[in-house]
Amino acid sequence: EFILIISGSNKSATKLYHQSMNLISRALIVNAIVKWFFMKIAIVRLSALGDIVHSMVVLQFIKKHYPDSVIDWIVEKRFQGVLKSNPHINQIHQVIFSSAKESKSLFLFWNELRKIRKLGKYDLVIDMQGLIKSALVARMISSDMTSGFDKDSLRESLAAIFYKRTYKIDYAENVIRRNLSLVSYALNFSVENESINRKEAFLYSAKEYVYDAVSATKKNILLIPGASYSSKCYPKEKFIELTRQIDANYIIIWGN
Protein backbone atom coordinates (compact mmCIF):
# COMPACT_ATOMS: atom_id res chain seq x y z
CA GLU A 1 0.00 0.00 0.00
CA PHE A 2 1.38 3.41 -1.02
CA ILE A 3 0.34 6.88 0.19
CA LEU A 4 1.73 9.58 -2.11
CA ILE A 5 1.69 13.20 -0.92
CA ILE A 6 3.00 15.82 -3.39
CA SER A 7 3.10 19.60 -2.89
CA GLY A 8 4.12 22.37 -5.31
CA SER A 9 2.91 23.84 -8.62
CA ASN A 10 0.59 21.84 -10.82
CA LYS A 11 3.29 21.28 -13.45
CA SER A 12 6.02 20.18 -11.04
CA ALA A 13 3.55 18.15 -9.01
CA THR A 14 2.35 16.32 -12.14
CA LYS A 15 5.93 15.58 -13.21
CA LEU A 16 6.84 14.35 -9.75
CA TYR A 17 3.69 12.26 -9.63
CA HIS A 18 4.54 10.46 -12.89
CA GLN A 19 8.14 9.90 -11.78
CA SER A 20 6.94 8.51 -8.46
CA MET A 21 4.41 6.22 -10.12
CA ASN A 22 7.08 4.91 -12.49
CA LEU A 23 9.33 4.09 -9.54
CA ILE A 24 6.47 2.43 -7.69
CA SER A 25 5.51 0.40 -10.77
CA ARG A 26 9.09 -0.78 -11.25
CA ALA A 27 9.35 -1.71 -7.58
CA LEU A 28 6.11 -3.70 -7.77
CA ILE A 29 7.24 -5.50 -10.92
CA VAL A 30 10.64 -6.38 -9.43
CA ASN A 31 8.97 -7.56 -6.24
CA ALA A 32 6.54 -9.74 -8.20
CA ILE A 33 9.36 -11.27 -10.26
CA VAL A 34 11.50 -11.99 -7.21
CA LYS A 35 8.53 -13.45 -5.35
CA TRP A 36 7.52 -15.63 -8.29
CA PHE A 37 10.95 -17.13 -8.98
CA PHE A 38 11.98 -17.44 -5.33
CA MET A 39 8.67 -18.84 -4.15
CA LYS A 40 8.31 -20.42 -0.75
CA ILE A 41 6.01 -23.40 -1.16
CA ALA A 42 4.48 -25.74 1.44
CA ILE A 43 3.17 -29.13 0.38
CA VAL A 44 0.71 -30.93 2.64
CA ARG A 45 0.69 -34.71 2.27
CA LEU A 46 0.43 -36.25 5.71
CA SER A 47 0.15 -39.94 4.84
CA ALA A 48 0.37 -42.75 3.86
CA LEU A 49 3.67 -44.23 2.72
CA GLY A 50 2.78 -45.12 -0.88
CA ASP A 51 0.80 -41.92 -1.40
CA ILE A 52 3.75 -39.84 -0.21
CA VAL A 53 6.09 -41.62 -2.64
CA HIS A 54 3.65 -40.92 -5.49
CA SER A 55 3.32 -37.29 -4.40
CA MET A 56 7.08 -36.76 -4.32
CA VAL A 57 7.15 -37.03 -8.12
CA VAL A 58 5.87 -33.44 -8.36
CA LEU A 59 9.01 -32.03 -6.72
CA GLN A 60 11.26 -32.54 -9.74
CA PHE A 61 8.74 -30.73 -11.96
CA ILE A 62 8.43 -27.80 -9.57
CA LYS A 63 12.22 -27.47 -9.45
CA LYS A 64 12.44 -27.70 -13.23
CA HIS A 65 10.20 -24.65 -13.64
CA TYR A 66 11.15 -22.85 -10.42
CA PRO A 67 14.73 -23.92 -9.65
CA ASP A 68 15.16 -21.32 -6.91
CA SER A 69 11.92 -22.12 -5.11
CA VAL A 70 12.01 -23.29 -1.49
CA ILE A 71 9.81 -26.32 -0.82
CA ASP A 72 8.78 -27.51 2.64
CA TRP A 73 6.69 -30.60 3.35
CA ILE A 74 4.20 -31.23 6.18
CA VAL A 75 3.87 -34.93 7.04
CA GLU A 76 2.89 -37.33 9.81
CA LYS A 77 5.95 -38.07 11.95
CA ARG A 78 5.92 -41.82 11.30
CA PHE A 79 6.24 -41.24 7.55
CA GLN A 80 8.83 -38.45 7.55
CA GLY A 81 11.75 -40.84 6.97
CA VAL A 82 10.79 -41.47 3.35
CA LEU A 83 11.20 -37.75 2.58
CA LYS A 84 14.59 -37.23 4.20
CA SER A 85 16.87 -38.05 1.28
CA ASN A 86 15.06 -35.97 -1.33
CA PRO A 87 17.31 -33.06 -2.41
CA HIS A 88 14.36 -30.92 -3.50
CA ILE A 89 12.91 -30.60 0.00
CA ASN A 90 14.16 -27.76 2.15
CA GLN A 91 12.48 -28.64 5.45
CA ILE A 92 10.24 -31.44 6.71
CA HIS A 93 7.68 -30.39 9.32
CA GLN A 94 6.23 -33.23 11.38
CA VAL A 95 2.79 -33.52 12.91
CA ILE A 96 1.43 -36.30 15.14
CA PHE A 97 -2.28 -36.46 14.38
CA SER A 98 -2.24 -40.24 14.80
CA SER A 99 -1.83 -39.86 18.58
CA ALA A 100 -4.78 -37.47 18.71
CA LYS A 101 -6.87 -39.93 16.72
CA GLU A 102 -5.96 -42.90 18.91
CA SER A 103 -6.69 -41.01 22.13
CA LYS A 104 -9.71 -39.24 20.59
CA SER A 105 -8.35 -35.98 21.94
CA LEU A 106 -9.44 -32.71 20.35
CA PHE A 107 -6.89 -30.95 22.54
CA LEU A 108 -3.98 -32.89 21.00
CA PHE A 109 -5.38 -32.30 17.51
CA TRP A 110 -5.72 -28.56 18.11
CA ASN A 111 -2.23 -28.44 19.63
CA GLU A 112 -0.76 -29.90 16.42
CA LEU A 113 -2.64 -27.32 14.35
CA ARG A 114 -1.23 -24.54 16.52
CA LYS A 115 2.29 -25.81 15.81
CA ILE A 116 1.56 -25.52 12.10
CA ARG A 117 0.49 -21.91 12.54
CA LYS A 118 3.99 -21.04 13.79
CA LEU A 119 5.80 -22.19 10.64
CA GLY A 120 5.93 -18.72 9.10
CA LYS A 121 4.47 -17.37 5.89
CA TYR A 122 4.49 -19.11 2.50
CA ASP A 123 3.71 -17.81 -0.96
CA LEU A 124 1.75 -20.95 -1.81
CA VAL A 125 0.36 -23.95 0.08
CA ILE A 126 -0.79 -27.02 -1.88
CA ASP A 127 -2.85 -29.73 -0.20
CA MET A 128 -2.16 -32.89 -2.18
CA GLN A 129 -4.12 -35.16 0.17
CA GLY A 130 -7.57 -33.63 -0.03
CA LEU A 131 -8.96 -34.75 3.32
CA ILE A 132 -10.66 -32.46 5.84
CA LYS A 133 -7.71 -33.06 8.18
CA SER A 134 -5.08 -32.08 5.61
CA ALA A 135 -7.20 -29.16 4.38
CA LEU A 136 -7.33 -27.79 7.92
CA VAL A 137 -3.55 -28.04 8.11
CA ALA A 138 -3.18 -26.25 4.77
CA ARG A 139 -5.54 -23.47 5.87
CA MET A 140 -3.74 -23.01 9.21
CA ILE A 141 -0.47 -22.25 7.42
CA SER A 142 -0.02 -18.54 6.83
CA SER A 143 0.09 -18.01 3.05
CA ASP A 144 -0.90 -15.78 0.15
CA MET A 145 -2.63 -18.70 -1.58
CA THR A 146 -3.95 -22.12 -0.53
CA SER A 147 -4.70 -24.51 -3.39
CA GLY A 148 -6.36 -27.92 -3.58
CA PHE A 149 -8.84 -30.12 -5.42
CA ASP A 150 -12.39 -28.88 -5.91
CA LYS A 151 -15.37 -30.51 -4.13
CA ASP A 152 -16.16 -32.80 -7.08
CA SER A 153 -12.60 -34.12 -7.13
CA LEU A 154 -12.46 -35.20 -3.48
CA ARG A 155 -13.62 -38.12 -1.39
CA GLU A 156 -14.24 -35.69 1.48
CA SER A 157 -15.81 -32.85 -0.50
CA LEU A 158 -16.04 -30.51 2.52
CA ALA A 159 -12.26 -30.18 2.42
CA ALA A 160 -12.59 -27.84 -0.57
CA ILE A 161 -14.09 -25.04 1.55
CA PHE A 162 -10.71 -24.51 3.23
CA TYR A 163 -8.89 -23.65 -0.02
CA LYS A 164 -8.71 -20.22 -1.60
CA ARG A 165 -8.35 -21.72 -5.07
CA THR A 166 -9.56 -25.12 -6.27
CA TYR A 167 -9.08 -27.21 -9.40
CA LYS A 168 -11.29 -29.88 -10.94
CA ILE A 169 -9.28 -33.05 -11.55
CA ASP A 170 -10.99 -36.40 -12.05
CA TYR A 171 -10.77 -38.50 -8.88
CA ALA A 172 -10.38 -41.63 -11.04
CA GLU A 173 -7.33 -40.19 -12.83
CA ASN A 174 -3.96 -41.92 -12.44
CA VAL A 175 -2.57 -40.72 -9.10
CA ILE A 176 0.71 -39.36 -10.50
CA ARG A 177 -1.05 -37.45 -13.28
CA ARG A 178 -3.64 -36.23 -10.78
CA ASN A 179 -0.97 -34.89 -8.44
CA LEU A 180 0.95 -33.28 -11.29
CA SER A 181 -2.21 -31.68 -12.66
CA LEU A 182 -2.92 -30.04 -9.31
CA VAL A 183 0.61 -28.70 -8.92
CA SER A 184 0.94 -27.55 -12.53
CA TYR A 185 -2.38 -25.66 -12.33
CA ALA A 186 -1.41 -24.06 -9.03
CA LEU A 187 1.99 -22.98 -10.37
CA ASN A 188 0.89 -22.24 -13.94
CA PHE A 189 3.10 -24.58 -15.94
CA SER A 190 2.33 -27.44 -18.31
CA VAL A 191 3.48 -31.06 -18.14
CA GLU A 192 3.83 -33.19 -21.26
CA ASN A 193 2.96 -36.89 -21.17
CA GLU A 194 6.47 -37.72 -22.33
CA SER A 195 7.91 -35.86 -19.34
CA ILE A 196 5.77 -37.93 -17.00
CA ASN A 197 6.89 -41.17 -18.64
CA ARG A 198 10.54 -40.11 -18.34
CA LYS A 199 10.34 -38.86 -14.76
CA GLU A 200 13.27 -39.39 -12.44
CA ALA A 201 13.01 -42.44 -10.21
CA PHE A 202 12.27 -42.24 -6.50
CA LEU A 203 15.46 -41.27 -4.62
CA TYR A 204 17.31 -41.04 -7.95
CA SER A 205 19.90 -38.86 -6.20
CA ALA A 206 21.17 -41.69 -3.98
CA LYS A 207 23.82 -42.75 -6.50
CA GLU A 208 26.19 -43.99 -3.81
CA TYR A 209 24.06 -47.09 -3.28
CA VAL A 210 25.00 -50.20 -5.25
CA TYR A 211 22.46 -52.99 -5.52
CA ASP A 212 24.36 -56.23 -6.02
CA ALA A 213 21.11 -58.13 -6.37
CA VAL A 214 20.27 -56.46 -9.69
CA SER A 215 20.77 -58.73 -12.69
CA ALA A 216 22.44 -57.51 -15.89
CA THR A 217 21.01 -60.34 -18.01
CA LYS A 218 17.43 -60.75 -16.78
CA LYS A 219 14.52 -58.45 -16.19
CA ASN A 220 14.48 -57.21 -12.61
CA ILE A 221 11.19 -57.19 -10.73
CA LEU A 222 10.96 -55.61 -7.30
CA LEU A 223 8.45 -57.04 -4.83
CA ILE A 224 7.32 -55.06 -1.79
CA PRO A 225 5.06 -57.32 0.29
CA GLY A 226 4.68 -54.98 3.28
CA ALA A 227 2.14 -52.20 3.85
CA SER A 228 1.06 -49.88 6.65
CA TYR A 229 -2.09 -51.98 7.20
CA SER A 230 -2.57 -55.73 6.81
CA SER A 231 -5.65 -55.08 4.66
CA LYS A 232 -3.37 -53.45 2.07
CA CYS A 233 -1.01 -56.44 1.82
CA TYR A 234 -1.11 -58.41 -1.42
CA PRO A 235 -1.58 -62.13 -0.56
CA LYS A 236 1.64 -64.17 -0.58
CA GLU A 237 -0.08 -66.79 -2.74
CA LYS A 238 -0.53 -64.15 -5.44
CA PHE A 239 3.15 -63.20 -5.25
CA ILE A 240 4.09 -66.88 -5.67
CA GLU A 241 1.76 -67.22 -8.65
CA LEU A 242 3.30 -64.13 -10.25
CA THR A 243 6.88 -65.38 -9.86
CA ARG A 244 5.97 -68.70 -11.46
CA GLN A 245 4.45 -67.03 -14.50
CA ILE A 246 7.20 -64.51 -15.26
CA ASP A 247 10.83 -65.54 -15.66
CA ALA A 248 12.80 -62.73 -14.03
CA ASN A 249 15.23 -61.81 -11.28
CA TYR A 250 13.05 -61.06 -8.26
CA ILE A 251 14.18 -58.74 -5.49
CA ILE A 252 12.19 -58.49 -2.27
CA ILE A 253 12.22 -55.40 -0.06
CA TRP A 254 10.93 -55.42 3.50
CA GLY A 255 11.16 -53.31 6.62
CA ASN A 256 9.42 -52.36 9.84
Predicted segments with their positions:
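Catalytic machinery of carbohydrate-active enzymes
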Residues: 4-256
